[in-house]
Amino acid sequence: MKYYLIAGEASGDLHASHLIAALKERDPEAVFRCYGGDMMQAQGAQLVGHYRDMAYMGIWPVLLHARTILRKMSECKRDILHWQPDVVVLVDYPGFNLKIARYVKSHTRIPVYYYIAPKIWAWKEHRIRAIRRDVDELFSILPFEVEFFEGKHHYPIHYVGNPTVDEVAAHRPTSATWQKPVIALLPGSRVQEIRGNLHRMLEAAAPFVRDYQLIVAQAPGQPDTVYMPIIEDCRRRFFPDVLMPVGLQSGGTFDLLSHAAAALVTSGTATLETALFRVPQVVCYYMKAGWLATLGRRLILKIPYISLVNLVAGREVVPELVADGMTPSRVRRHLSSILPGGEARQGQLDGYEEVARRLGSPGAPQRAAALMLELLRGAPLQS
């Protein structure tokens, strides 16, 4: 069969690459074409557009790059129409992907599958109408989404488990190369996130550099030039007398997390990855006009937490410092409490065990691939 996949950011590229691998195992004749990233391409998909050209967030960045985004969307629509796949598989990234779903349903008879459901339980709940109209099958990776979609909106979905469980379980760490214990800094995957978060993370962690090595996770596709000016500025300002206080780690976050004593993490999939590696963390996310962003969050978001760790647990397991709550002094205070010997460390580790139980066993990409093929072939679904 011919599969057309669309992923709009680094985490979607990772999850989609594992789904492609699982589909290839079950469909020897599978051919893949995608808008995505390097990992999808490495699995054999023909990459016709990279997510780097579409990964903008926030009102102003999106408006400033609206022409680019619209051009990429038009190219994607034309490519689907020309290639005529057997199925279009959308991976997260709802602002772009739901528009693609509308186009596919309006202009073709190609089925639309959605892997990693849009997070409409957080905001833009009205999108359920578009999902109901334009998405044939929805594959969820978060256990609490079943009650939201099926219980509240009477829209049937497939919970297949969480692929992050598989990815962490499959990782084999390399030998540590650092002389001191590590504090991992994960400032995000987009340029705007990195520029907003990294400086504040480094300032918060500065008092610990004599006992810990600070290692920044370099997001896939982001060059050194995004990070090094910030790192060098902070080195001069906050720890000029410490030899090599900050390192930049490329090649993914898993090796870094497997050796970290604690972490500062932006929201998103990275918070779940950090929890599954059993690394205590502080979730911190800077926004411009912080007090206004905090007010907007309270008015718009329909959820009590922003991190997947807390949402899966149904309670606060990790602290969340967002918008005007993310100050270096607050981050520093929480970081101190989760380092070895800190009073909050064991409570987080206990909470992580609860999160792992709720997510379930490995096998999410394989279960999703098997379900997709059964649906496409018209075979009866296995219970």
Language-model features: where?
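Nucleotide-activated sugar donor-binding and catalytic core shared by glycosyltransferases
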Residues: 1-383
